[in-house]
Amino acid sequence: MIIVTGGAGFIGSNIVKALNDKGITDILVVDNLKDGTKFVNLVDLDIADYMDKEDFLIQIMAGEEFGDVEAIFHEGACSSTTEWDGKYMMDNNYQYSKELLHYCLEREIPLLYASSAATYGGRTSDFIESREYEKPLNVYGYSKFLFDEYVRQILPEANSQIVGFRYFNVYGPREGHKGSMASVAFHLNTQLNNGESPKLFEGSENFKRDFVYVGDVADVNLWFLENGVSGIFNLGTGRAESFQAVADATLAYHKKGQIEYIPFPDKLKGRYQAFTQADLTNLRAAGYDKPFKTVAEGVTEYMAWLNRDA
């Protein structure tokens, strides 16, 4: 069996899909379906069982077994970069992850977990997986950074695989439940389909991020499971592209629309990553050599998926 925490969420459900595509259906999805809209991410997927995250954590802490577990993909977390309840964030992202890590280490179960580019904070260059480059801007980034630091202490002694992926700006199918935290491509598509003007912040040609397609993210996760490599790795494309490029690809697909530029909100000033670009040196050195989709390629594929029933 393979366990996917956050399996009804954005990246987790795409990992479930990638496993299904390889003929793997003996999957336990762990999630919190308090937000009932997330169920749609699993409707077209095949899993063996579902468990609430609180029940799962109780069983993990009690040392209970789940049968023959081949691996755990740990994607479950609070991923809101605007959530400032530090206790909630640390319980959800840090303590939970530590419990799961020790459970896996005791049983030599591979653990592949979600870290984040938020660990780098506001820097504009040198996104390198090393302590001197890490300075998170928010408590979400800090919770991810602290778990990475914890893993670094344990890695030299670990007898089983531990791998963390610092996700950059992931976009693609199955993110609709994320609301305001969904990608720009998702929001632009919704605005166009609602007959509204698609909106970007003023200066969006200058805001550049490493936008990585979720299908590529799932591919990397499965490659690492198959190859057993441990460590903490950036997971982006290695290319920074502008929000304007995302809008251009969206409009090109729809063949209509004109961008309306809106003022940059005060509440985000100083807390907003203006530039991200993954350094892929370590990922490539680990042996992962597949190309990543460009924004034009990924957004076009995503638009076709979003509008498949149109």
UniProtKB/Swiss-Prot annotation:
It catalyses: ADP-D-glycero-beta-D-manno-heptose = ADP-L-glycero-beta-D-manno-heptose. Binds 1 NADP(+) per subunit. One of its GO terms (molecular function) is NADP binding. NADP(+) binds at residues 10-11, 31-32, 38, 53, 75-79, 92, 144, 170, 178. The active site is at Y140, K178. Its cofactor is NADP(+). The modification N6-acetyllysine is found at K267. Substrate binds at N169, S180, H187, F201, E202, G203, S204, R209, Y272. GO terms for biological process: ADP-L-glycero-beta-D-manno-heptose biosynthetic process; carbohydrate metabolic process. Keywords: Acetylation, Carbohydrate metabolism, Isomerase, NADP. Pathway: Nucleotide-sugar biosynthesis; ADP-L-glycero-beta-D-manno-heptose biosynthesis; ADP-L-glycero-beta-D-manno-heptose from D-glycero-beta-D-manno-heptose 7-phosphate: step 4/4. Its EC number is 5.1.3.20. Disulfide bonds: none annotated. InterPro entries: Epimerase_deHydtase, Heptose_epim, NAD(P)-bd_dom_sf. Belongs to the NAD(P)-dependent epimerase/dehydratase family. HldD subfamily. HAMAP family: Heptose_epimerase. Catalyzes the interconversion between ADP-D-glycero-beta-D-manno-heptose and ADP-L-glycero-beta-D-manno-heptose via an epimerization at carbon 6 of the heptose. Contains a large N-terminal NADP-binding domain, and a smaller C-terminal substrate-binding domain. Homopentamer. This is ADP-L-glycero-D-manno-heptose-6-epimerase.
